[in-house]
Amino acid sequence: GEAPLDNAGKLVSALPETSNLIVDPLDVLESQEPPSRFRSFMNDLQNHVVNTGSLGILHCLEGRSVPPLRDTTEHFADVVFHLQTNIKGDEVENKLAIPKFRGGRAPSDIIKLDLVERVSIDTSRDIA
């Protein structure tokens, strides 16, 4: 079969104007060798998204093994969202941090989210 970066590059170049592209998860592409090929793919993706007025969402998993090129992914990203989920007994707590917001101002506070049937944001000030 084709190498994952080659296949992904063909799909990206075929995206029509004003597309929404979701890569879920990006981990397989971040793990390809050599690293220069991944950087080239990210450059092409960024250029195509900008030139077509599109949106790219790259879902990056953090777990036992984070791919070595995750820093490269975050460098290319315009906005980085970090969602942290903690489980205490039978309660689930979700917190969202936005450490990078290119061209804007990232919130300095961590945002507590209630992810049930719909998303609500806890606007009380106990969001640290």
Regions found by a protein language model. Give the residues of each.
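Conserved inter-motif catalytic segment of the P-loop NTP-binding fold
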Residues: 1-35
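NTP-binding/hydrolysis catalytic cores, primarily Walker-type P-loop NTPases
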Residues: 8-16, 113-128
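Conserved catalytic network of the ASCE P-loop NTPase/AAA+ motor domain
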Residues: 12-16, 47-52, 72-75
